[in-house]
Amino acid sequence: MANSKSAKKRALQSEKRRQHNASRRSMLRTYVKKVIAAIKAGDHKTATEAFAAAQPIVDRMATKGLIHKNKAARHKARLNAKIKALAA
């Protein structure tokens, strides 16, 4: 339990940031799941559109520090490869 005034403030800030990050992480997962669902359905057009919407979100989360930039690149590369395989 936080005893000093500054420790209490830091605890409040930490909780606020945790909730904000959880919301953003959930949004990121939702966008990625939409792409995966379209790929599993075999719908190339929908998958491409969902990927186009998800790509800037993934990049933004990497910029904000929510996920590592390499993880963002890996997400995008793997999803894009699956979409290209769907077209072939």
From Swiss-Prot:
Database matches in SUPFAM superfamilies: Ribosomal protein S20
Database matches in InterPro entries: Ribosomal_bS20, Ribosomal_bS20_sf
Keyword entries, A-Z: Ribonucleoprotein, Ribosomal protein, RNA-binding, rRNA-binding
Superkingdom of the source species: Bacteria
GO biological process, alphabetically ordered: translation
Annotated GO CC locations: cytosol; small ribosomal subunit
Region described as Disordered: spans on this chain: 1-27
Gene3D superfamilies: Ribosomal protein S20
GO MF, one annotated term: small ribosomal subunit rRNA binding
Assigned protein family: Belongs to the bacterial ribosomal protein bS20 family.
Cited function: Binds directly to 16S ribosomal RNA.
Listed name of the protein: Small ribosomal subunit protein bS20
UniProt organism field: Shewanella sp. (strain ANA-3)
